[in-house]
């Protein structure tokens, strides 16, 4: 690292401390959703392989959760793999699944966070399913940030699965279709989502400059605030995180009003 890079790093850290010092902690979001985008483009820009980009993105996750732990954030949802990602070439998908499995095991072994899977288990390899179940069991007692790992996740699929779960639940209880139709409301459907009784995201961060949701938590983000960051996920810094919190705190949430 040359002198210019060292000086730039020092200035960024000083600026981050200044931003952090002016944060209103009463306005920190309780639930943050993250669309971690840009691993492949970061790798291409740095002359690295796609797999290296995914590994760099995976390594950023613990650092990010550490920043969240320094605030009053209570829930973080990380979108690690979408249902659409299964259409990627096998030479990319297979290593990516291995990297994600390593992430799950690392988060569970860390001991600071409670891990919960959101997504469709049926799409995942048996080894990944085992890792997720073991992570949930091993961290169920932890009184730290609840980390939703969205793996094999699609927003429309989640809603379809919620409706299916609701119908099956009614069938098990002997509820007629007529009675179910009369009793269905927003809260009932919400209870059958992957996130169940969790609070909806207050803030959704998407990296890489893309300004779209791509189906992320379609039901839960009806009143969420969004923050789009130009930085690719592997290059996401604490100062970028603090800027997102500052931007969120400055907004006036209307909840449709």
Please give the residue ranges for each predicted region.
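Flexible, compositionally biased loop and terminal segments
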Residues: 1-257
């Amino acid at each position: 690292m040359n002198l210019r890079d060292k000086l730039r790093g020092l200035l960024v850290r000083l600026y981050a401390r200044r931003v952090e010092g002016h944060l209103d902690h009463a306005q920190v979001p309780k639930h943050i959703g993250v669309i971690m985008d840009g691993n492949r483009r970061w790798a291409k820009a740095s002359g690295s392989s796609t797999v290296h980009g995914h590994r760099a993105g995976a390594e950023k996750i613990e650092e990010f959760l550490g920043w969240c732990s320094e605030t009053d954030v209570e829930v973080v949802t990380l979108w690690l793999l979408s249902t659409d990602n299964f259409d990627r070439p096998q030479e990319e998908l297979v290593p990516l699944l291995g990297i994600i499995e390593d992430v799950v095991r690392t988060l569970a072994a860390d001991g600071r966070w409670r891990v919960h899977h959101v997504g469709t288990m049926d799409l995942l390899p048996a080894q990944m399913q085992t890792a997720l179940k073991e992570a949930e069991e091993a961290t169920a007692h932890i009184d730290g940030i609840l980390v939703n790992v969205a793996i094999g996740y699609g927003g429309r699929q989640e809603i379809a699965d919620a409706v299916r779960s609701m119908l099956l639940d009614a069938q098990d209880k002997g509820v007629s279709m007529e009675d179910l139709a009369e009793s269905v409301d927003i809260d009932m459907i919400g209870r059958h989502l992957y996130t169940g009784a969790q609070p909806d995201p207050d803030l959704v961060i998407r990296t890489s400059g893309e300004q779209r949701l791509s189906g992320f938590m379609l039901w839960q983000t009806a009143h969420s605030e969004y923050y789009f960051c130009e930085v690719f996920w592997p290059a996401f810094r604490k100062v970028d995180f603090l800027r997102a919190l500052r931007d969120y705190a400055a907004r006036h949430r209307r909840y449709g009003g």
